[in-house]
Amino acid sequence: MDKLAVGPGYPEGVIDLARSPSDNIRAIAAAKGVAPGDIIACVLDRPRHADLIAELRALGCGISLISDGDVAGVIAVTDPDTTIDVYMGQGGAPEGVLAAAALRCVGGQFQGRLVFRNDDERARAARWGVTDLDRIYHLEELASGDVIFAATGVTDGTLLKGVKRRRDCITTESVVMRASTGTVRWVKGEHHREPGMTC
């Protein structure tokens, strides 16, 4: 899935997968009142993104390359502490739906378009009822209703710390978000081997 996401505070329609990455960067910069070189794009560090990265570098904008976790990369656009303005690139469609669900909870814009590598994938999409193979899906189409997003870190990442094994317990870090209230809860869990023990 091609993915394009920005956090809250931008005018509706500031991003559009039908436009080039450079045009999207320029639109985001104009909405922010800065030069394109002041925009930071988060991109999954994969060979398939070589042309995208080259285009962004030619434009002069900053690039934050991540090794994995494009859901966390999309969520990063909502966190002012990351300084990331936009997420761009291709990744799995299920992850696109998860990222859209998180953005529904905290605000932002997301667009996704299915990418097909071969005729078998196109045929499978047709069997699932996908008739427009070039359709651009918007946030509300991918995550509608009273969305609740929950994630727990398994390994350390940019969004959550991974599972830590201690002498008498295991600790976890989770986030739970709800669209209807905009509530975000960060949960640090202690899972004890025996009741009454502490970490």
Q: Model-found features: residue ranges?
A:
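IMPase-like, lithium-sensitive Mg2+-dependent phosphomonoesterase catalytic core
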Residues: 1-199
